[in-house]
Amino acid sequence: MSIQAPRGFNDILPGEQYGWRDSYRWQRLEEIFREVARLYGYQELRPPMVEYVDLFIHGVGATTDIVTKEMFNITPRGDDPDARRMAMRPEFTAGLVRAWLENGLYNNPQPTKIFAYGPAFRYENVQKGRFRGFHQLDVEVFGAQDPAVDAEVIKLGLDVVARLGLTGLVVSVNSIGCPQCRPRYRQALQDHFRPHLGELCEDCNTRFEKNPLRLLDCKRDADHPAQRTAPVTLDYLCDDCRRHWEGLLSHLAAMGIPYQIDTRIVRGLDYYTKTVFEVLHPKLGAQSALWGGGRYDGLIEIVGGKPTPGVGFGMGMERVLMVLEEEGLTAPFADRPRLDVFVATLGEAARPVGLKLLYALRDAGLSADIDYLGRSLKAQMKYAGKQNSRYVVILGEDEVRQGVASVKHMDEGTQESVPLDQIISHLRRAEA
């Protein structure tokens, strides 16, 4: 039997040879994200990976592809007293809204600014940059409707990738209005597309009645003439949405953020209102969006709270790391942690002394390791080199009798004898 990871899921592994799947690259991206989010005043919230399906039906939208085609549902046990259908989270926002409401975070000083990161799951058609198990960096702001906040979350994401040296990004923005002005736009779309339904795909025909905005999001019919001539939402905005839209563009300009207006961006979730945006990189081809998001001023009310504005984004970690690899941007990962000390022992008498030294080194805050395979000294030295150790402490039976050890500086290639009780202080002086 061949045992392998399910299709569309990836192992994240220790080692530069694994490219974008190198776990150290993931750690650095997470660290940079946390640092930038905290600079912006965001705090971490860790929601569960599983939520009740009802949350996504009401929050994300019953007719969205995520709910109808892509969710990994969990069938409850027959003897489960709480036998409601659950699902692995397909995105973060709905679960973070649920956590904000359930735990009374609305009682804290507002707005609430939170970040989260971790895995999410969708039954996707697997291709470059699109997986069934994927990871997101997520930020959300609850309780502020100022368009300056929309601009802030866009800037936050750009600051994260700027620290990684990533350039050549395109910020695409649009406004899809609100429940007051969207019905008029919805009707305009239906009037426009109705004569062409026989030429459009099955999904478009389904969306025509249930959610005509999603017609603009169709990939199969993207080049159809009716798509290119469709009404644009910006022509149908109410006064409030137009002021918000103009405010967003003003703030982006003030921040020096270049942007393009793309009236076909509607995003694939029903909860969006007003601002929607995507940040693109051409190296990913069809999956060129590294991250996207927008405003969802009605979502919290839909989930059961009081009317509360919200805005945020989800950034695809796999996509960011894949682009960094394709661009050859390795500098952010150059400070890969090294093993401080490898303890090489030779002979039975040296073994317990080496183990005692190993634990003393670790207690002193130095990363340290020792051979557990009974290898020769030559093989131990070779292994220490592969581990990129800074120093090797060599202990043989003669050294033990003399109360000393040989300390080899691996970068310099020098070696000297040091009393055992001075090993730690010697290594600290060498690093000073």
Swiss-Prot record:
The keyword Nucleotide-binding applies. GO terms for molecular function: ATP binding; catalytic activity, acting on a protein; histidine-tRNA ligase activity; transferase activity. Keywords: Aminoacyl-tRNA synthetase, ATP-binding, Cytoplasm, Ligase, Nucleotide-binding, Protein biosynthesis. InterPro entries: aa-tRNA-synth_II (IPR006195), aa-tRNA-synth_II/BPL/LPL (IPR045864), Anticodon-bd (IPR004154), Anticodon-bd_dom_sf (IPR036621), His-tRNA-ligase (IPR015807), HisRS-like_core (IPR041715), HisRS/HisZ (IPR004516), HisRS_anticodon (IPR033656). It is found in: Cytoplasm. It catalyses: tRNA(His) + L-histidine + ATP = L-histidyl-tRNA(His) + AMP + diphosphate + H(+). One of its GO terms (biological process) is histidyl-tRNA aminoacylation. Its main location: cytoplasm. Its EC number is 6.1.1.21. PROSITE patterns: AA_TRNA_LIGASE_II. One of its GO terms (cellular component) is cytoplasm. Transmembrane segments: none annotated. It is an enzyme of class 6 (ligase). HAMAP family: His_tRNA_synth. Belongs to the class-II aminoacyl-tRNA synthetase family. Homodimer. NCBIfam families: hisS. This is Histidine--tRNA ligase. It comes from Symbiobacterium thermophilum (strain DSM 24528 / JCM 14929 / IAM 14863 / T).
